[in-house]
């Protein structure tokens, strides 16, 4: 059943990348993966449900690939970041139309569930970039990490535009190396170790990806904790220590709600939850809200 579901998701992604979401029918997806349309409807009630599953599937693939790169001790932290940037550029080139929909798509074309999921995916990418920068450069960049995230996004956006209109395929290695070299120079020559952006601007930037309008921090915290508990409860007890993870999440929630939460304990608990590798979205958002 899992392989059949994966085949459908890969076929849908291929078609969404070649055309776009609104132009692809369930019948076309069925023909692409050589199944009956009825077989697809047994697994996905609608094209929107299929898209939601595909967004989650893509996100898990991205996180898994990044985790493998992070575990490659043969590479330096800077080389790992370079490879992550290249991987993202390659992914966009392979699935251009699909990522165009996520990045530039008309929100009127999707229902509220799809729009919310697209916002969550964008939020995950933003937090993933933040984490990748910290892993590469260390915690000394924490005071201005969001400045670097915005600069990284600006460079990525323009190079993605070039890839979008390219007539002859661009070499991605030099592009990735240029992006990292530019970040290196910015960090090296920075005159102040503080962010150039006021805190309210940073909050607006973070929240813009995860919601239709900025939400109160306490609301975002509550939503992220709820998602964390839900994610832990869905894990297999055979593969994960669900009881320990549940206890850690409960301790994190209790500490986060204190008037003066202890930073060392928050970092320790988030670090432990992060090690699972499968709770990326809620953990990244909690890290943003509670630590950086």
Swiss-Prot record:
GO terms for molecular function: DNA binding. Residues 2-62 form the HTH tetR-type domain. Keywords: DNA-binding, Repressor, Transcription, Transcription regulation. It comes from the Bacteria. Residues 25-44 bind DNA. The keyword Manganese does not apply. The keyword Cytoplasm does not apply. PANTHER family: HTH-TYPE TRANSCRIPTIONAL REGULATOR RUTR, TRANSCRIPTIONAL REGULATOR, TETR FAMILY. This is Uncharacterized HTH-type transcriptional regulator YcnC. It comes from Bacillus subtilis (strain 168). The gene is ycnC.
């Amino acid at each position: 059943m899992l392989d059949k579901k994966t085949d459908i998701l890969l076929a849908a992604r291929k078609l969404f990348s070649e055309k776009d979401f609104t132009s692809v029918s369930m019948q076309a997806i069925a023909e692409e993966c050589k199944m009956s349309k009825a077989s697809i409807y047994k697994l996905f009630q609608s094209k929107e449900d299929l898209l939601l599953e595909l967004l989650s599937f893509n996100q898990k693939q991205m996180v898994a690939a990044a985790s493998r790169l992070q575990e490659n001790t043969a590479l330096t932290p800077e080389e790992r970041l370079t490879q992550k940037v290249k991987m993202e550029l390659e992914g966009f080139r392979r699935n251009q139309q699909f990522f165009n929909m996520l990045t530039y798509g008309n929100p009127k074309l999707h229902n509220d569930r799809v729009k919310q999921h697209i916002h969550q995916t964008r939020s995950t990418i933003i937090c993933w970039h933040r984490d990748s920068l910290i892993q590469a450069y260390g915690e000394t960049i924490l005071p201005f990490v969001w400045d670097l995230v915005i600069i990284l996004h600006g460079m990525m956006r323009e190079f993605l535009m070039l890839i979008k209109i390219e007539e002859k395929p661009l070499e991605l290695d030099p592009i990735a190396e240029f992006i990292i070299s530019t970040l290196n120079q910015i960090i090296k020559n920075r005159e102040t170790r503080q962010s150039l952006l006021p805190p309210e601007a940073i909050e607006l930037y973070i929240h813009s990806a995860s919601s239709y309008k900025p939400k109160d921090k306490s609301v975002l915290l509550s939503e992220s904790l709820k998602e964390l508990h839900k994610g832990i409860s869905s894990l297999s007890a055979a593969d994960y220590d669900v009881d320990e993870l549940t206890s850690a999440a409960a301790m994190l929630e209790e500490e986060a709600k204190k008037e003066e939460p202890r930073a060392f304990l928050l970092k320790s608990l988030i670090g432990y939850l992060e090690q699972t590798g499968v709770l990326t979205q809620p953990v990244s958002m909690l890290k943003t809200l509670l630590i950086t």
